[in-house]
Structure formats: C-alpha cells, structure tokens
A protein has these predicted regions:
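Helix-coil modules at protein/domain termini and other flexible surface or pore-lining loops
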Residues: 1-202
C-alpha cells in the first residue's frame, strides 16, 4: 500500500466554498473523496504526493474543520503510525486550541491504537495545518490512498514536466535495454515528446 499526506487551507464566500478551496489547495479538490476508517497495510509506503486524475474515486482519511467566525484559529491534524503487520491513522481538529497540543493528542491516540493491537510502531508521521479565519475559512489534512488508476498528468506540461518525462523515458530505455520509441506526455493536452531509440527527443 502507498499513501501520501497532504494539507491545505483557504477562504471562501461560504463555508462550503472555503472547504472546497482548501481541498484544491491540498491538491485533492478535483477528485471524489471516499472517506475510509483508519487502517493501513503493514509496511505501508509513504510517498510524495503526485497529481491525481480529475474525477477519480480516491480513498482517504480526512481531517477537516471549517468556520465562518472571523478570528477563529482552526487546526486540522492527521497522525499515521506504520507497523510491520498493519498501520493506523487518526484525525483531530480544534478551534482556538494549541496546535502542538492537538498534535500530541493525535500521536497519543494513534500510539494507543497500535498498542491495543499489539503492533510495534516502526514510524509515526504527523501533519498539522492551522488557519486564521478572515470570513469563512477551512483547513484540511488528509492521508490519501494511492494506486495506479488515480495517478496521472493533470493539464498541460510545462518545461519542467517535459524534462522530467524525457529523463524518465531515457532512464527506462537504458535500464530495460530494449529499442523502444515511447511517447510521453498528456494525450489530451496535445503536447507530446517522442523519444527515439537512443533515448533522445526527436
């Protein structure tokens, strides 16, 4: 199992829009989120977040808080504990509470969940985000469950993306040791890079 941890915060004209904008800020605003209970496979791999295909069905553990009371400080926290046989996730939120204390509470809870299951903790990762409300604000932290079906390019490729795609294709050619001529890029954007058998763009 592979996961990524993301967070975002933002304002909006309404509480719903603020929440939506916070999801967009976290990179998960263009997918359908399916909230799951807080269990992971053993030796779950934590990865950097990558763009997701718009409209995908994405499983996640979501910690979210929204307020339309100006001046409120809202905090969302997720804590992940990874073990050999399984892992656990907890979420915690608070309004005008000490973020450090909320993090400590989340860590305590996830440690307890692992302890009650007689599972030794190999790693704990915590993500916290705090936002001071101006009008209507929201903060979210989420553990996203990744798979090949939901990961993909989003939008047009800039020069940095083109270089990454070119370097990746060249690396594949060298490692596999076969004569291949892949096209890399986003078919819908109309921007392609054709890689020759020698690994150079053509």
């Amino acid at each position: 199992m592979k996961i990524a941890i993301v967070s975002g915060k933002d304002e909006g004209p309404t509480k719903l829009n603020a929440f939506d904008n916070a999801l967009l800020a976290a990179g998960i605003g263009d997918v359908n989120l399916i909230k799951v209970s807080s269990m992971l496979w053993g030796n779950t791999e934590l990865q950097d977040f990558v763009p997701l295909k718009p409209g995908s069905m994405v499983k996640c553990v979501l910690s979210s808080i929204t307020s339309d009371n100006p001046g409120d400080e809202i905090t969302a926290v997720v804590a992940v504990a990874i073990g050999e046989n399984l892992g656990c996730v907890v979420e915690e939120t608070g309004t005008n509470e000490n973020p450090a204390e909320l993090k400590d509470k989340a860590i305590f809870m996830v440690k307890y969940m692992m302890e009650i299951r007689n599972e030794t903790i190999k790693e704990i990762v915590v993500k916290e985000i705090t936002h001071k409300v101006e009008k209507s604000g929201s903060a979210i932290a989420s553990v996203v469950y990744l798979n090949d079906e939901i990961v993909g390019w989003c939008g047009k490729m800039d020069e940095r993306d083109k270089k990454i795609a070119t370097d990746l294709a060249y690396k594949i050619i060298k490692e596999v040791g076969r004569k291949i001529r892949p096209y890399v890029g986003h078919p819908e954007s109309g921007e392609y890079i054709k890689i020759g058998a020698d690994g150079t763009p053509t």
